[in-house]
Amino acid sequence: MDQRFIALLKKFNYSCDSVIFQFIRYTQPGWLFNLRPTIEEDFASCYIPEENIDPAFLDITYETHTARLADAGYRLWCKGVLLESNTNEIKNISAEKPGLQDEYIFIRKYWGNAWAYYTLLIRLFTFKNPVNEINHFFKTRYIKKIDVFDSPIMYPAYENFYSELIATTPKVAVIIPTLNRYTYLKDVLHDLEQQTYKNFEVLVFDQSDDFQPEFYTQFQLDIKITKQVEKKLWTARNNAIKSTTASYLLFFDDDSRVGSDWISEHLKCIDFFNCDISAGVSLAVTGQKISKSYAYFRWADQFDSGNAMVKRDVFKKIGLFDEQFNGMRMGDGEFAYR
């Protein structure tokens, strides 16, 4: 695991010890749901206590019982079960780690043979015992990859859920940093004009070389324009957060398109699941097929700063975006780790 990433985990009070398979660091090095906080608190996790699992759900292909439980937890997490654990619950699970054969089963089952070969090569080049590695690699060659995102857990009550949060009409601030993209921004603001939820303001931090304040007069929106001389994305977002008293902050990109229920759906999600962040996803191309893993509710394993609603209290607790990431794309990733 990258030493910078380990330092980041320690900064945020996370143990670098995985509560499931160690090999996940090769396929999902930034995935935090397999780690445990070093402080006593409840946390989102892929660990499921043994008393909460049907024995029939366990995969007996694994050699160790720990691996069977870890596999079940990972599978349920991927299918949309919102698992939570606390530090006390998982103190004892480190007694028996999944063996090397179990690790290769896990890789083949969820990522396939190509990733198994990749993992083997990494471990051989990092001076792991070649006899053990090759032996367990070939012992697991019969394992077939599964579609873990098939048959997800659904939340049917969501469709007809009456949101008291929406009924109270809290103020929402839609935050848009922009740079030389007036052509795309026109569509963005037109989409916001069509929103069914009305109590929102639009905060545009315009860093364009040819600043055009008259461009914004065509829109029927509560829109506040700030000309920012510095071309700094995370500074713009932080300045927007500091400039508003809105209870909910909705981050948007200057080249995205959304439906008319975009704001209301984010609020409804926060209300239904009693969560602090509603993390949407962004598709690179209009009309692009949505990945199976994005088609249902689950714990978010990424924070898309172009489509996410955050309670203001979150920033009060953990701070603003780190402006050291100006000029880079990982400002939202670092925020997500926190």
Task: Show the residue positions of the predicted features.
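Short aromatic/hydrophobic "clamp" motif used to bind/position activated sugar donors
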Residues: 249
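Conserved donor NDP-sugar-binding/catalytic core segment of glycosyltransferases
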Residues: 1-24, 257-293
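A recurrent flexible, glycine/aromatic-enriched loop bordering the glycosyltransferase active site
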Residues: 14-18, 23-50, 292-310, 326-328, ...
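Acidic donor-binding loop at a coil-to-helix junction in glycosyltransferase catalytic cores
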Residues: 63-71, 328-335
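N-proximal low-complexity "stem/linker" segments adjacent to membrane-targeting elements
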Residues: 135-191
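Acidic donor-binding segment of Leloir-type glycosyltransferases
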Residues: 189-227
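Active-site-adjacent helix/loop segment of glycosyltransferases
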Residues: 79-145
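Glycine-rich, basic loop-to-helix element that forms the pyrophosphate-binding segment
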Residues: 228-244, 294-295
